[in-house]
Amino acid sequence: MASPGTPGTRMTTTVSINISTPSFYNPQKKFAPVVAPKPKVNPFKTGGTSESSQPQPPGTGAQRAQIGRVGEIPVSVTAEELPLPPPPPPGEELSFSSNCAFPPPPPPFEEPFPPAPDEAFPSPPPPPPPMFDEGPALQIPPGSTGSVEKPLAPKAHVEISSAPRDPTPPFPSKFTPKPSGTLSSKPPGLDSTPAPAPWAAPQQRKEPLASVPPPPSLPSQPTAKFTPPPVASSPGSKPGATVPMAPSNSTRYPTSLQTQFTAPSPSGPLSRPQPPNFTYAQQWERPQVQEKPVPTEKSAAVKDMRRPTADPPKGNSPLTMKEVEELELLTQKLMKDMDHPPPVEAATSELCGFCRKPLSRTQPAVRALDCLFHVECFTCFKCEKQLQGQQFYNVDEKPFCEDCYAGTLEKCSVCKQTITDRMLKATGNSYHPQCFTCVMCHTPLEGASFIVDQANQPHCVDDYHRKYAPRCSVCSEPIMPEPGKDETVRVVALEKNFHMKCYKCEDCGRPLSIEADENGCFPLDGHVLCMKCHTVRAKTAC
């Protein structure tokens, strides 16, 4: 807390707070809920004043302590009489304000609020760079930090005509801003922004969006993109209170305000006081809510851009009577063309395969047997039944229906049924595969060797030899082919049949050769003898 012997310090703090009002909209600052202590010395007390150093209760005295306009300080005090205050110790505001209790709510206002500024400032842009102060005091614009006396220059010619009529009661501030993250590079003894006065906090809390009117001596100011309607003025304030600025800061002050405020101030017939629990975070959030007209205009522009594409959906609208009639005429014409196609002469190569007449491309035709036929020409060769879309059979390049084709099929020689599936041809006859078997053992002969007899009956090889093969004159067995062979080997001598193994000499049993040599057969009186036995029997007979 500042020393009671430096009243000029309080006066400077008040002016600095009002000038640096845009710093409250810095969204990066975090403020703790603290209450400012009661001042021991009246900040407006000068050498000739007799006011008490204690804060007055809510009434006319409190109204004189409330500063409603930027730069409203007593006329008798000038900037030359105010010495530079010492900087407050770091963390002082947080230490003594944490134990203070909240005061009771203020009584109803008896007088109206001061007049609203002539121009409302928009909402703040991104947070400004950190300044050299440690609270919500004056934020020195760029280029004005080189000298200590520059912030005090615009305070020399300031009038305070509307300060006594300010109806705002001075109750203690709830929040005291923390020092900014970046500290000043100047030494603590040269800091020109002291701690804020206790009566400045209620004004900041009750009028968070109150804007500062621009000085009349300024030239042309840059206009903002979005200018909201001005706040309705209060009837109890004086419109003539102005704050003339020094030439050195006249161009910097409005520029900083125009660049930091972009949201409109709340408009109404009378500004209502905010409750004590109104925080700086809420003050920062309100301009964001009022920035919604800008995206609304963009959305309206987008709708206007999309409107041309959304207007012409005429295709989805119902057809008119004229369009319906045109569609009906086109449909009737199409159906007539389909029912009565125009005659088209066919090429000379496209001839009917039966009547040899030309085919029209518009007439239906049947392609079968690698030829084109008229529908009426493609019929059964036997019964002349139309075969379009029906199953037919090709017999010698002639179409037959199923019934007529069955009459042309072969009949099985065994079962006497028509062969419509697989057929076997043997001995000049047709057989079903299952019907072509041996007549003796009924073994299927499909794919096997068979022999037919004189009655044209098929026999397997074994049954045929057993039934028709010659028999051996020695063993009386049928002479059959050896196993694994298809040829039958037999020896015929003296009109007799012999197996090879049975062709021997009857007297000595010596195998005889089939050749005409000395080992061959020398028959005698119907006996098969070898040469030796033949000689013996011949000598005996003599």
From Swiss-Prot:
Its main location: cytoplasm. Residues 102-131 have a biased composition (Pro residues). PROSITE patterns: LIM_DOMAIN_1, LIM_DOMAIN_2. GO terms for molecular function: alpha-actinin binding; metal ion binding. It is found in: Cytoplasm; Cytoplasm, Cytoskeleton; Cell junction, Focal adhesion; Nucleus. GO terms for biological process: cell adhesion; integrin-mediated signaling pathway; transforming growth factor beta receptor signaling pathway. It holds the Pfam family LIM. Residues 247-265 have a biased composition (Polar residues). One of its GO terms (cellular component) is stress fiber. Keywords: Cell adhesion, Cell junction, Cytoplasm, Cytoskeleton, LIM domain, Metal-binding, Nucleus, Repeat, Zinc. Residues 352-411, 412-471, 472-538 form the LIM zinc-binding domain. InterPro entries: Znf_LIM. Residues 300-309 have a biased composition (Basic and acidic residues). Residues 22-319 are annotated as: Disordered. Residues 27-45 have a biased composition (Low complexity). Adhesion plaque protein. Binds alpha-actinin and the CRP protein. May be a component of a signal transduction pathway that mediates adhesion-stimulated changes in gene expression. Belongs to the zyxin/ajuba family. This is Zyxin. The gene is ZYX.
